């Protein structure tokens, strides 16, 4: 009986380890070719809006908000290694920061405590009404970085265009990103 339990536990553990071999986005492993991965995103309701040499853009809803997804892949093998969620722009710093804090809380529950850098530098300070100018000029950083054994997740605020900022979440699969870098190095 003990042997059966040990064997079953070993099999279960190997399934769990296999299932967690790649970082996921919306429960879709960040793995496979662009066509395979994009087909899964289309099935989840996203629409392709652009195809470029190293990324494919899709539009849809994530966490109840309109966004653009940027699916990054290896130029050599077309293997997907990262997904960027770029939320639609916002003008209101308070709303943007609130969204950032809510998403950071959820990511912290899922991935653990992040490395955080949230600051305005002189001559700017939070609440002075110049948040966009501070971000545009490099006087502000708002980023939470989560590191796991299988990948990296970053949540950050960036300026988008005149007087607008946006919230971005990046999901990078460690294994496929390293594979992509090696493929590029092999080309040199």
Locations of regions flagged by a protein language model:
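Periplasmic/extracytosolic POTRA-like scaffold domains at the N-termini of outer-membrane
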Residues: 25-32
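Alpha-helical interaction segments
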Residues: 8, 27, 136-137
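Boundary at the C-terminal end of the N-terminal hydrophobic targeting segment
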Residues: 19-21
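A cross-family detector of function-defining hotspots
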Residues: 33-79, 84-188
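Sec-dependent N-terminal signal peptides
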Residues: 4-17
């Amino acid at each position: 009986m003990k042997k059966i339990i040990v064997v079953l536990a070993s099999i279960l553990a190997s399934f769990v380890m296999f299932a967690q071999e790649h970082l996921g986005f919306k429960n879709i492993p960040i793995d496979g070719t662009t066509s395979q991965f994009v087909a899964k995103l289309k099935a989840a309701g996203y629409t392709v809006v652009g195809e470029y040499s190293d990324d494919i853009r899709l539009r849809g809803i994530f966490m109840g908000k309109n966004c653009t997804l940027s699916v990054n892949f290896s130029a050599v093998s077309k293997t997907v290694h990262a997904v960027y969620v770029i939320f639609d722009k916002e003008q209101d710093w308070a709303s943007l920061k609130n969204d950032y804090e809510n998403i950071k809380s959820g990511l912290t529950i899922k991935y653990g405590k992040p490395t955080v850098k949230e600051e305005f530098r002189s001559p700017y300070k939070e609440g002075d009404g110049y948040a966009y100018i501070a971000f545009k000029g490099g006087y502000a950083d708002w980023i939470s970085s989560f590191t796991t054994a299988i990948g990296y997740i970053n949540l950050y605020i960036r300026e988008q265009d005149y007087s607008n900022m946006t919230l971005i979440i990046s999901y990078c699969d460690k294994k496929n990103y390293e594979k992509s870098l090696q493929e590029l190095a092999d080309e040199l």
